[in-house]
Regions:
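Small-residue-biased structural context
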Residues: 1-176
Length: 176
C-alpha cells in the first residue's frame, strides 16, 4: 500500500516536502520564515494586483473570478498578522525551548483552519482554478501563480501542523 501511495504525485510531493525540511525546531522555524513567510509576502501583493486586473478587464464574462482580488486582500492582512505572531512570539519561544506553548500553538492551528477556509473560497470563486477556453495571458498567469501560492501555503501549514507543533504540544496519556 505504501508503494502505491508513493506513486501518487500528491502523496510523493507531501512526503518529499516534509522529508526535506529541517527537523530541529530552531532550524525549522528559520526555514519557515526564510522560505514560506518571505515567499508569501512576495507573491500575494502581485496576485492581488493581477486578480484586480483580470476582474476589471473581464467583468462582463461569466467565468470572471468576481471577488477574488478582495479575498486575496483579506488573505494578505490575515497572513501578515499570523506570520508576525509566529515571528515575534511563537518562533522565539520555540528557539528558547520554552514550555507552555499549547495556547499559542492552538491559536496558530485555528489560524491555519481559517487559511484553509480562505483557500476553499478562492477555489469556489475560480471554479477550482479552471480557466475559460479563451483566457488571456494575465488570467492564465493569475491561475498558475495562484495555484503555486496555494500549494506553498498548504505545505507551510502541513509542515507546522505535522512536523513543528507536535514537538511542543503536551501529550495526554490515558490509562487503559
Amino acid at each position: 500500500l505504501k508503494d502505491f501511495l508513493l506513486q501518487l504525485p500528491e502523496a510523493d510531493a507531501m512526503t518529499t516536502k516534509t522529508d526535506r525540511v529541517p527537523q530541529n525546531p530552531a532550524e525549522l522555524t528559520r526555514f519557515i520564515e526564510a522560505h514560506y513567510h518571505a515567499k508569501h509576502r512576495a507573491d500575494l501583493p502581485f496576485l492581488v494586483e493581477l486578480a484586480a486586473k483580470v476582474e476589471a478587464v473581464h467583468n462582463d464574462q461569466p467565468d470572471v473570478p468576481a471577488g477574488l482580488a478582495e479575498l486575496l486582500r483579506e488573505m494578505v492582512g490575515d497572513l501578515e498578522v499570523h506570520m508576525k505572531k509566529e515571528e515575534l512570539i511563537l518562533f522565539p519561544a520555540i528557539r528558547r525551548s520554552a514550555e507552555e506553548l499549547d495556547v499559542p500553538i492552538t491559536a496558530m492551528r485555528e489560524d491555519h483552519d481559517d487559511h484553509a477556509e480562505q483557500i476553499e473560497k478562492i477555489k469556489n470563486v475560480t471554479a477550482n482554478l479552471t480557466l475559460p477556453e479563451d483566457a488571456c495571458r494575465s488570467w492564465t498567469r493569475l491561475y498558475t501563480d495562484l495555484s503555486a501560492f496555494i500549494c506553498d501555503l498548504e505545505d507551510h501549514i502541513r509542515i507546522e501542523n505535522d512536523v513543528l507543533f507536535p514537538q511542543f504540544e503536551k501529550r495526554v496519556v490515558l490509562d487503559v
